[in-house]
Design a protein with these regions (language model features):
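Internal active-site segments that recognize and position negatively charged phosphoryl groups
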Residues: 143-174
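A glycine-rich beta-to-alpha transition motif near the start of alpha/beta enzyme domains, typified by
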Residues: 3-118, 166-281
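Generic low-complexity segments that are intrinsically disordered, proline-rich and/or Lys/Arg-biased
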Residues: 5-11, 128, 136, 156
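Hydrophobic alpha-helical segments and helix pairs
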Residues: 100-139, 143
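Short glycine-rich anion-binding loops that position phosphate/pyrophosphate groups of nucleotides
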Residues: 25, 127, 163
Length: 281
């Protein structure tokens, strides 16, 4: 009897490489060290590696490389293969991965990450609030945008290295994240697509948050989403000072004052190390 599944065809050459599986509050990453040798990561390869059934599985693939401007560079690929500018949770993992405090070159600019017990503090830089920096398709107020989707309140928009829209809901229990998330992410108002944040103030300087991430969908946590939401909340005078942001995966503390940089504090976890043949993806 013939085996019903054809064998995997042999390859002429293999490109073996090591990786680490890491996460920040359950937002998980495959982290590849490309400082000693280039690793060819295409959108198709990133998508295959991120596949939880046929690949290694992750929300984002992180490529750590050399930099002329910083200690290391970081490239970020979502699970759909798209390359993005920033990822707060991944940034907290970098000092744990390299074993020291680091200045990181990203597509969003230079980010400084300092290791603390169990995690890191990251200077995420200053938020951008102008409509064309989000970017939006046309000019409008980004603090209270004159747009709406179904019963959601008027949102705010913030760019923290990547674009975010933030809805402050009175009660999130009735919000259909799986339907509204992709609907808003791909709305023509957002020419670069957008990360969609559903937030609820649940106490003094305490926000509950669920994020539909651009290119990844619902995740356990989104560091840049927590930063964008805290910035929007400060601008609307809903919070003041360091703010606890509770996501499905746990808590982050975000500190921002108007005109300043955003400081994000939270955990980072190393899960395991592995080795893979990248030509098979």
């Amino acid at each position: 009897m013939d085996w019903p599944f054809p064998p995997t065809p042999p390859t002429c050459a293999t490109i073996m490489g090591r990786f680490s599986k890491m996460h920040g509050l359950g937002n998980d990453f495959v982290v590849i060290d490309a400082r000693e040798g280039a690793v060819d990561i295409t959108p198709t390869r990133a998508q295959a590696i991120a596949d939880r059934h046929a690949g290694i599985g992750c929300d984002q693939l992180i490529l750590i490389g050399q930099s002329d401007r910083a200690d290391v560079s970081m490239r970020i690929f979502n699970s759909d293969g798209s390359e993005v500018e920033a990822c707060g949770n991944a940034t907290r993992c970098v000092p744990l991965f390299v074993g020291r405090d680091v200045l990181i070159e990203t597509r969003a600019g230079l980010l400084e990450a300092k290791a603390i017990d169990g995690g890191a503090i990251v200077d995420m830089g200053a938020p951008r609030l102008d409509w064309d920096a989000i970017p939006l398709a046309y000019a409008m107020d980004t603090l209270t945008m004159p747009v709406s989707w179904e019963d959601l309140p008027a949102p705010a928009a913030v760019n923290v290295g990547n674009p975010h829209v933030v809805f402050f809901c009175d009660d999130m229990n009735g919000v259909n994240f799986d339907r509204l998330g992709p609907l808003i992410e791909t709305d023509p108002l957002f020419p670069a697509r957008v990360n969609v944040n559903f937030a609820q103030v649940i106490g003094d300087n305490h926000i509950r948050l669920v994020v539909w991430e651009r290119g990844a969908g619902l995740t356990r946590a989104c560091g840049t989403g927590a930063c964008a939401t805290a910035v929007a909340a400060v601008r609307r005078k809903l919070v003041s000072g360091p703010t606890r942001v509770t996501l499905p995966g746990g808590d982050l503390v975000i500190d921002w004052q108007p005109g300043g940089h955003i400081l994000m504090t939270g955990p980072a976890t190393h899960v395991f190390d592995g080795e893979a043949d990248w030509t098979r993806f």
